[in-house]
């Protein structure tokens, strides 16, 4: 692996990537194991498991070995209120080299409707706030200190409201989802310091789908995909294929179009607890400068009213 040993070049690159002097489209944080926390990207995600509180956390370190590379952590909670209403909350922190820091706090509301004997569709709303902060103190640009570029003269500390929408069609064996979790575009430095617009965050559109094939009584195949589109950025497409053994051990491979190949594994430690890990091997032009990306998650189900009594109730597999 090659190294970039001049920190100010890395910091300047990352800063300019996220705070270009021209408008640009900033991608939301990405996760290889998105299928285990879909409520973060789609407020309509529904579990249809009354009395069960789903808790989860996920942490990702991207491009390990590249100074100033992003790291992302998220926590989420989701539960049905009754057979038609489900609600959730999520918190996400995205940090880029201790220069750019974004915190998102959202609440989700989903309304579930039956459309057949085994099929349901839910419609969801997401509302919350994005808090965007920068720390340019001590940053060295290629042109010199921060006083050599008006865009970096002052730190930024701003909050932006956000609204999102989504739809989720599902059965026990497959799902399709479409969502726009950030409907309100934001401009982090609009008309400040003589700059027309810096750091534009545009609307992201997500389309997800997956199927659970029963190979035999102990083996299931779970292909899935996620497509993500945002103005000014190329289409992002994740394709994964997992196998589930004895409803406990799950492992799979994935590919992110033009970006990375991934391997993931998770284990159901108890009926209520699952832990997992994923590794991404970078295939784009940054691959020479990092050793890949790592991601861990934990999922925990809380039986609020003792409905499960220690046993599964026709468990869902997504």
Q: Which role does the model predict for each range below?
A:
Residues 26-318:
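Subset of outer-membrane beta-barrel
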Residues 2-12:
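Bacterial N-terminal signal peptides that target proteins for export
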Residues 1-2, 27:
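N-terminal hydrophobic targeting signals that begin at the initiator methionine
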Residues 21-25:
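Sec/Tat signal peptide C-region and signal peptidase I cleavage site
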């Amino acid at each position: 692996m090659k190294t970039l040993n001049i920190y100010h070049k890395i910091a300047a690159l990352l800063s300019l990537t996220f705070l270009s002097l021209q408008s640009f489209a900033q991608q939301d944080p990405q996760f290889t194991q998105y299928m285990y926390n879909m409520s973060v990207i789609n407020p309509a995600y529904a579990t249809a498991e009354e009395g069960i509180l789903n808790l989860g956390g996920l942490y990702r370190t991207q491009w390990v070995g590249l100074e100033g590379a992003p790291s992302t952590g998220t926590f989420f909670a989701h539960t049905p209120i009754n057979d038609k209403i489900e609600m959730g909350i999520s918190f996400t922190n995205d940090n880029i080299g201790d220069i750019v820091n974004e915190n998102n706090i959202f609440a989700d509301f989903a309304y579930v409707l039956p459309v057949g004997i085994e099929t349901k569709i839910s419609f969801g709303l997401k509302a919350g706030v994005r808090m965007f902060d920068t720390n340019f103190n001590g940053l060295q640009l290629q042109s010199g200190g921060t006083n050599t570029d008006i865009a970096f003269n002052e730190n930024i500390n701003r909050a932006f409201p956000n609204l999102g929408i989504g739809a989720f069609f599902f059965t026990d064996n497959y799902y399709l989802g479409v969502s726009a979790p950030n409907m309100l575009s934001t401009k982090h430095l609009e008309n400040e310091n003589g700059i027309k617009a810096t750091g534009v965050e545009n609307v992201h559109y997500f389309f997800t789908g997956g199927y659970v094939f029963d190979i035999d009584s102990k083996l299931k195949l779970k292909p899935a995909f996620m497509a993500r589109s945002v103005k000014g950025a190329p289409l992002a497409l994740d394709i994964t294929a997992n196998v589930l053994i004895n409803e406990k051990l799950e492992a799979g491979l994935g590919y992110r179009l033009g970006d990375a190949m991934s391997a993931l594994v998770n284990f159901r430690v108890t009926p209520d607890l699952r832990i997992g890990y994923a590794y991404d091997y970078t295939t784009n032009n940054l691959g020479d400068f990092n050793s890949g990306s790592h991601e861990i998650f934990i999922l925990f189900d809380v039986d609020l009213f003792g409905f499960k009594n220690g046993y599964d109730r026709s468990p869902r597999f997504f």
